[in-house]
Regions:
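Aromatic- and Gly/Pro-enriched helix-to-coil junctions and flexible linker segments
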Residues: 1-175
């Protein structure tokens, strides 16, 4: 796949050309997407992998983010301690939990897809961006971030005055 669309966002997955067709209220628009070889950066452990695990609930206190983890797998609570998570995710070389030799056999992918029993239930779908992030990080060799990797230094939410829902608009768009 060149790109995937999830929740309205187009995410580059591999070099190539794709066409995206969007329809809303009977109106259609077509967008041509070109992903070049240099446009697919390595998956970031800090900025992508850890947030995926947090978003899926894996690093919550009720799951692997608890002080002792679950099932021998421990993550820091909500991804707070990158060194703990890095040790857990990268420390088992040639292990079954995260296998660079056969990424699809990694328990990090198989359990949340429910390919093997998982007490936490299904947390991923094979066509989701979250699954692609985790799988591609493993395929790329479970690399840690370089010293020059981008870091989030601030976050601004718009509108700045906060939530402004009205009865006619039950959802609020934040940018």
């Amino acid at each position: 796949k060149v790109a995937v669309v999830e929740r309205g966002a187009i995410v580059a997955m591999a070099p190539g050309v794709a066409k995206v067709l969007a329809t809303v209220d009977g109106k259609m628009a077509t967008l041509h997407v070109i992903v070049g070889k240099n446009q697919v950066p390595p998956i970031s452990l800090r900025n992508e992998v850890i947030p995926v695990l947090s978003r899926q609930g894996c690093s919550s206190g009720a799951c692997h983010g608890s002080p002792k983890g679950k099932g021998g797998f421990r993550l820091s609570l909500r991804g707070f301690d990158l060194s703990v998570d890095e040790t857990t995710l990268r420390g088992e070389f040639f292990a079954r939990r995260v296998s660079v030799l056969d990424p699809d056999s990694s328990l990090l992918l198989r359990k949340p897809l429910m390919h093997v029993p998982h007490a936490g239930g299904q947390r991923l779908h094979s066509d989701s961006v979250s699954h692609h992030v985790l799988r591609n990080w493993i395929v790329q060799g479970r690399q840690t971030d370089s010293a020059v990797a981008p870091r989030c230094v601030s976050l601004q939410i718009y509108p700045p005055s906060g939530r402004q829902l009205t009865r006619q608009a039950p959802n609020q768009q934040f940018v």
